[in-house]
Curated annotation (Swiss-Prot):
Family from the record: Belongs to the class-III pyridoxal-phosphate-dependent aminotransferase family. HemL subfamily.
Keyword Cytoplasm (UniProt): yes
This protein's name: Glutamate-1-semialdehyde 2,1-aminomutase
Involved pathway(s): Porphyrin-containing compound metabolism; protoporphyrin-IX biosynthesis; 5-aminolevulinate from L-glutamyl-tRNA(Glu): step 2/2
Cofactor(s) required for function per UniProt: pyridoxal 5'-phosphate
Positions of modified residues (N6-(pyridoxal phosphate)lysine): 268
Predominant subcellular localization, coarse grouping: cytoplasm
EC number(s) given by UniProt: 5.4.3.8
HAMAP family per UniProt: HemL_aminotrans_3
GO biological process: protoporphyrinogen IX biosynthetic process
Organism: Methanopyrus kandleri (strain AV19 / DSM 6324 / JCM 9639 / NBRC 100938)
Amino acid sequence: MGYEDEFPESLELFKRAERVMPGGVSSPVRRFDPYPFYVERAEGSRLYTVDGHVLIDYCLAFGPLILGHAHPEVVEAVVERVREGFHYGTPTLPELKLAEKVVELVPNVEKVRLVNTGTEATMSAIRLARAYTGREKIVKFEGCYHGAHDAVLVRAGSGASELGAPDSPGIPESVAENTLVCPFNDVEAFVETVERFDEEIGAVIVEPVLGNAGCVPPDEEFLKVLREYCDGTERLLIFDEVITGFRLELGGAQEYYGIDADLVCLGKILGGGLPIGAFGGPEEYMSRVAPEGKVYQAGTFNGNPVSATAGLVTLEVLERERPYDELSSKAERLASALEDGLEDRGIEGVVNRVESMFQVYFGIEEVRDYADVNSADHDAFKRFHRELLEHGVWIAASNYEAWFLSIAHTETDLERTEEAFEEALDRLTG
């Protein structure tokens, strides 16, 4: 049976969606050929589609659901909070508690501003860095996706890469000119760039792990060089930890790699599955944010008590259970099984992993930057993705996204996934 036969109800819903939504979806990365399936509900490690299929989920909404879907403690807290109202437009105890927890857990953060998305977090952090340094240019890295705002949608990753349009129409050249782009992990290119534009640079922004090009870890010296440059020139180093925050360690990539950023951007896990974002850092910088300072940032739904409640409970569970060794072990097992499967069949490819996030790249032996990701065999990945889906395993449809593990993934899930690897790889070589 073909995909259309397996997902007929999803097809009818997608036809309706195409009539009223651009491309039939609310975010480009959710679209894949011939059309996306629709999910009715989710629990633990499983998605339940409108067509009656049950899928083991390693996309996890692109990373937020480190506890799995509908974790009982999160659900109970959110339901209780919703009974008290959804949003008030006033300060609330949940936002205060979440802010206190972020300051407690995340290195080098003394104050934090809660926003609604990762995009808002990076946009605001860049504005703050420019205001603090008095310089307009920023340095970013190829494939690093920092949200959908003009300053950073230049040679970005995630859906921008998959669409082949990382430089979106509608971005003024005058804006793009203030964004300097270097290859990820290329220290020499970074040094050349900052030497050329040094007096104009206000900030360096980076995903510590390139998670919007799959999973590309930093070379040992790469992040250190960025930190040393910013230390020596009084520029601000911004870590975009929307993906890595609370994922690699409780204190995120700063704790994991032992390198402090000046400003850190958070999202995904911070909201426990509900919309949220945040940026924070030392009081020296954050005191510039309005109303304490003059750097303006505001939002009707900033600090939403329902999102803050979900996020707080999620962080409390992570703090209590400290599941990071377990999560890493699960991911290592699957990554190793996939590597063995490639080797046994003589399939060229590589699996990159950092703790509980990983990705496979076909047709290439090493992936350490965005150019390598672009050189991988994406047609092979799409076939592999489709085969896994037919065997009940869901991963993001794009090679530019990561796979994620959660505490909800069971031994049975891992065994079934390993079996699906075998079947899918056999089909690739058959």
